[in-house]
């Protein structure tokens, strides 16, 4: 119940005037609120949601192509009649002949669409408040597009039958070997055992690519917890910590570096639980357009804006045309679970 504070009036002499006015707590409160709003300092910074997107770091994107429904890539396989060992000329009757087998891969391209509707009075109010609702919506759409691209890059669009860097069905995932502790996770492994996991993945990709040096994996994705662990934990020698972190130890001593390849070990939140049995997954691959990439035939932009009398608003449509992740070489692409 609202308390009413009524002041008792002394009985004044009768002079023909009216009684003195009183004010209750509600009236006083609203008046103070108005005064406080006049005195407050407005913070012009609009705090957006905390989030992150990493797809531009982990895949090369090629723009251009228009509103296509698919993109294609051609492959070639070579063979020689008679085999490669028998290449001696002049002492045989038949000359070997080269053959080429061409094939084409098709990749889906899906339209991205999002709209915004701004009432005319909200646009006019922006002139009073100094904050544009259109700019706020535009920032939200940009963030939504980046999140869409993140999911498309790492996981694909399951509803449309596409996959990403972390879950391609053509790649067989295997578990890393257990360490001396009997466990596979890096938190229970020594720096040398972690390096063995890194090198094993790199060598597996290199071996699968017929030891082609250009196919040595140069990019590794791991979950953020393990990324933090190897960066904050120092390598110990005879029980004494050194000023070298496990991360620096891995970067300096992996097999890829011995072959002249600079290895990047980066964190990716989509690696959490991406493996078999919801284990954390490590992914090793060659981060170059020749090996893996993604087409964006039409980058995201505002394609139209028109007034809508029925809703007293301006409606805008944003669109993009985004392709699925294209893994051109499966053999040097490695999944290792259980880290």
Q: Where do the protein language model's features map onto the residues?
A:
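Sequence/fold signature of self-assembling virion shell proteins
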Residues: 1-58, 231-339
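Alpha-helix boundary/N-cap detector
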Residues: 26, 30-33, 37, 107, ...
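Hydrophobic, Leu/Ile/Phe/Ala-enriched alpha-helical segments that form helix-helix packing faces
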Residues: 145, 149-152, 198-209, 250-254
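Alpha-helical scaffold segments that mediate packing/assembly in large oligomeric complexes
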Residues: 113-197
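Extended, solvent-exposed, turn-rich assembly/linker loops in the middle of proteins
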Residues: 166-242
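Assembly/oligomerization interface modules of large self-assembling protein complexes
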Residues: 32-114
């Amino acid at each position: 119940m609202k308390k009413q504070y009524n002041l008792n009036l002394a009985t004044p002499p009768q002079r023909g005037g009216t009684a003195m006015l009183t004010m209750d707590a509600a009236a006083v409160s609203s008046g103070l609120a108005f005064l406080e709003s006049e005195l407050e300092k407005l913070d012009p910074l609009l705090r957006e949601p905390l989030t992150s997107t990493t797809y531009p770091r982990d895949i090369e994107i090629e723009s251009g192509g228009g509103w296509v429904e698919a993109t294609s890539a051609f492959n070639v396989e070579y063979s020689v009649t008679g085999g490669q060992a028998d290449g001696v000329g002049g002492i045989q009757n038949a000359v070997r002949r080269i053959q080429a087998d061409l094939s084409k891969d098709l990749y889906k391209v899906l339209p991205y669409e999002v709209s915004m509707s701004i009432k005319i009075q909200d646009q006019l109010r922006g002139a009073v408040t100094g904050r544009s609702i259109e700019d706020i919506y535009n920032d939200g759409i940009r963030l939504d597009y980046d999140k869409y691209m993140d999911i498309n890059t790492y996981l694909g669009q399951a509803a449309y039958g596409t996959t990403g860097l972390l879950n391609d069905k053509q790649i067989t995932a295997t578990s890393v070997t257990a360490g001396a502790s009997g466990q596979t996770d890096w938190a229970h492994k020594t720096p040398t055992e972690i390096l063995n996991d890194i090198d094993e993945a790199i060598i597996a990709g290199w071996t699968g690519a017929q030891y082609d040096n250009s196919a040595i994996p140069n990019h590794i994705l791991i979950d953020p917890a393990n990324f933090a662990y190897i960066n904050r934990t120092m390598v110990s020698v005879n029980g004494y910590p050194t000023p070298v972190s496990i991360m620096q130890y891995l970067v300096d001593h992996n097999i890829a570096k011995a072959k002249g390849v600079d290895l990047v070990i980066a964190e990716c939140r989509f690696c959490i639980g991406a493996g078999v049995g919801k284990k954390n997954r490590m992914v090793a691959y060659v981060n170059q357009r020749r090996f893996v990439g993604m087409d964006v035939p039409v980058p995201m932009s505002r394609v139209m804006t028109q007034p809508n009398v029925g809703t007293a608003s301006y409606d805008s449509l944003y669109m993009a045309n985004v392709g699925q992740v294209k893994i051109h070489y499966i053999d040097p692409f490695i999944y290792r679970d259980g880290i």
